[in-house]
Structures are given as C-alpha cells and as structure tokens.
C-alpha cells in the first residue's frame, strides 16, 4: 500500500517520469487495443501470444515507471498514465494466462492446440505480488466437491 501511495504522490519531473520522451496516451491505448485484438482475441496461437507479450512489454517500457509531472488535483495527464498502466497490467495477465493454457476452451480457441484437454478443466487465478504476476490453478467447483467427498 505504501508503494502505491508513494507512486501517486511522486514527482515525475519530465512529461514521462524522467524515463522517456512524452507519450500520447490515446495513441498508446489504441496501440494496446490493436495488439489485443490482433493477437489475444478469440483465435490465438502461441506465436501471436508471444508477439502480444513483446508489444505489451515495449509499451510498458515506453510508459516509464513514474507518472509524468507533479502530483496535482485533476491532472488528466497523470490520470491517463495510471489508466494506461493498469490496462497494460491487465493485458499482460490475460496474455500470459492464455499462454499458460495450451488448449481450446469455450470461446477462446488456440489454433495451434484445437482440442480441450481434461487436465485443464481448472480455473486460473492471477495475483500481482510485488510487481510480478503469480499464476495458480484451482479445481472447478464441481470437481472440488467430488475431491472433498
């Protein structure tokens, strides 16, 4: 929690946290949307997902580690920075969850893995711990009841 408070109140200095040149947030969001639509949509392959992961990483690096400018009320540039930062985190979690599930299930089809695999009848849980994602699997509720009895 302290880390989040420090980030919100941080003085980013230059237009992009002193890390990079200023970035048009709307253009970055459009680029992220294109990456997700093209490579992480309902029809996926390992290659597309890896390409998406690289694109998301590049956008994250371009965004920088600190928000632009100084903390001030109603600073839309800072707000957009935090919005994009959160969008990139969710995009990364979705992409890696898909990479870690090498099968087709429901509306999401792996063109390189067209079959449903019984061992993947699980839920994926994603937690963010210290800036890193932790992926775990838990049984589907119906299976959990059978296992408990």
Annotate each predicted stretch with a short phrase:
Residues 1-149:
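Glycine- and aromatic-enriched mobile tails/lids
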């Amino acid at each position: 929690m302290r880390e989040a408070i420090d980030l919100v109140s941080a003085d980013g200095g230059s237009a992009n946290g002193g890390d990079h040149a200023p970035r048009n947030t709307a253009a970055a969001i459009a680029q992220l949307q294109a990456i997700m639509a093209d490579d992480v949509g309902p029809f996926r392959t390992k290659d597309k997902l890896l390409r998406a992961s690289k694109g998301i990483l590049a956008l994250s690096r371009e965004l920088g580690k600190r928000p632009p400018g100084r903390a001030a009320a109603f600073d839309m540039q800072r707000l957009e920075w935090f919005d994009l930062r959160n969008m990139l985190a969710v995009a990364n979690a979705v992409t890696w969850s898909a990479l870690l599930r090498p099968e087709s299930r429901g509306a999401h089809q792996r063109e390189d893995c067209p079959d449903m695999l019984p061992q993947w009848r699980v839920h994926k849980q994603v937690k963010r711990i210290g800036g890193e994602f932790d992926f775990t699997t838990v049984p589907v509720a119906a299976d959990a009841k059978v296992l408990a009895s």
